[in-house]
Amino acid sequence: MAPSNIVVQSSSTPPVAGGDEEFAPSVWGDFFVTYAPPVSQASEQRMSERAELLKAQVCQAFDAASMDVAGLVTYVDTLERLGLDNHFRDLIGAALERIGAEELPEHGGGLHIVALRFRLLRQHGIWVSTDVFDAFREDAGGFCSSLCSDDPRGLLSLYNAAHMAVPGEVVLDDAIAFARGRLLDIISKGEVRSPVSEQITRALDIPLPRFTRRLETMHYIAEYEHEEAHDGLLLELARLNFVLVRALHLRELKDLSLWWRELYNTVKLPYARDRMVEIYFWTCGMLHEEEYSLARMFFAKTFGMVSLMDDTFDVHATLDECHKLKEAMQRWDESEVSILPEYLRLLYIKTLSNFKEFEEILEPNKKYRMAYTKEAYKLCSKNYLKEAIWSNQKYQPSFKEHEELSIMTSGLPMLTILTLMGFGDEATPEAFEWVSSVPEMVRAGSQVTRFLNDLSSYKLGKNKKDMPGSVETYMVENGLTGDEAAAAIAALLENRWRILNQTRMEIDHTLLPAVQVVVNMARANEIIYLHGRDAYTFGADLKDLVTTLFLKQVLPL
């Protein structure tokens, strides 16, 4: 979970509203409860019927056998960036097999196509050697200076592709440094036109492999029509699909807002963050496709409940109350509610009742997933208690101790399991076992979350209670200044992304659904903590993005 950046309360009853130490109220209130989308049910039905016709036409046009490799690479990338790939998974899978098996002809498509092929294959778990970039390097090993200004699209593709590096790939370190420097220079001089200029600016903030796919789709649909070789069929389908998926998201957000309002008003914990809209934005950044509706609902509801528990441990409960809350969670039985202080009893009862509802929703052959879910939730409470003990004792952990605990308190292992609970048959028992064991990839995803979070806290000058974050812990242990320690944590963050990349290409493909959840959660965190903000705790920082993604009418039909 995101850290609670306010001072601990020591009373045993909720604080009176109005103190400087409280979180700001929701910037949305009940807006999405009453919001009426401009798309009517009837027009939505017509759009859906039109979209189905267009999908059939795309299937006919998508002839992998007749396209050359460069054309296939471009077509697959276009489908993915337009948010259409989930409708053509089998066709894309066949195309990727051919793209991986066939080499590009010499200088086929230039740097742009070579880099695009490299990125696509690695993102889909297919190994590609960095040797493909040798043709664009000089004898001394550096990249050719001729790439500086005459191929901005190629430089951008190289920059994005290089962020699929695995640990130790010096060639891609050089590629990132080279391309970033040239792209910054191009932008500062205004040497590139729209839409490439916007795409460069976006990538310099967050490289494409780490950017949330739904936001990229929102931007790219508006940009795609300005490309000379754009496909009108794909553009129309992408616009329809975006509006239809948004309509589904708005229905889900309304349902979640109603659910959250009832929960938040029932448990009466005014010290806790009221952030369901931000949670749902986070959810869509992780999984936006229609088929993951149940997974989104499980994720958002659980995130909301664990956030209430997190804030209780962090900013309000006494240490004795923390022990009692942890103990009640371990027992997982409504009859144990009496061990809790009065103000926490409704939170406990509502948590258990919501988990019962989750189980009732699951199909009989998927109910085994609840055991993993409950254990993960219980483990969260154990680790929150450990943080509370450290804070109470003013304990200065070693960096290793802090890292080990924060992997679990990041919430990513538990939330990955909760998300997979809403998947279909592609989420196997082996996937639940794998995530529950917290393997290296889950650890790396958790560390991406924690390091982004702690870099934000350092820049904001705030931390959980008086608990040191990873920046402060690293600084003390290594005798560094704060900025030096922050730079070291940023380097560790980059390394963890590379571990995520490496695991995608090495892991058993039956685990790829779980792998993708971990990667997508890390992607969503890049947006939440962009430029050192904490847009979950400080919801106003996310308001413009929420407005654009869910409300702004930017797509003519």
Swiss-Prot record:
InterPro entries: Isoprenoid_synthase_dom_sf, Terpene_cyclase-like_1_C, Terpene_cyclase_plant_C1, Terpene_synth_N, Terpene_synth_N_sf, Terpene_synthase-like, Terpene_synthase_metal-bd, Terpenoid_cyclase/PrenylTrfase
Family annotation (Pfam families): Terpene_synth (PF01397), Terpene_synth_C (PF03936)
Residues that bind Mg(2+) 2: 310, 314
Binding site for Mg(2+) 3: 453, 457
EC number: 4.2.3.197
Site (Required for the use of hedycaryol as a transient intermediate during the reprotonation of germacrene A): residue numbering on this chain: 303
Keyword terms of this UniProt record: Cytoplasm, Lyase, Magnesium, Manganese, Metal-binding, Plant defense
Record keyword Lyase present: yes
Cofactor comment text: Binds 3 Mg(2+) or Mn(2+) ions per subunit.
GO biological process: defense response; diterpenoid biosynthetic process
Binding site for Mg(2+) 1: 310, 314
Localization, UniProt: Cytoplasm
Reaction(s) the record says it catalyses: (2E,6E)-farnesyl diphosphate + 2 H2O = 7-epi-ent-eudesmane-5,11-diol + diphosphate
Domain notes: The Asp-Asp-Xaa-Xaa-Asp/Glu (DDXXD/E) motif is important for the catalytic activity, presumably through binding to Mg(2+).
Subunit structure, as described in the record: Monomer.
Name by which UniProt lists this protein: Eudesmanediol synthase
Gene source species: Zea mays
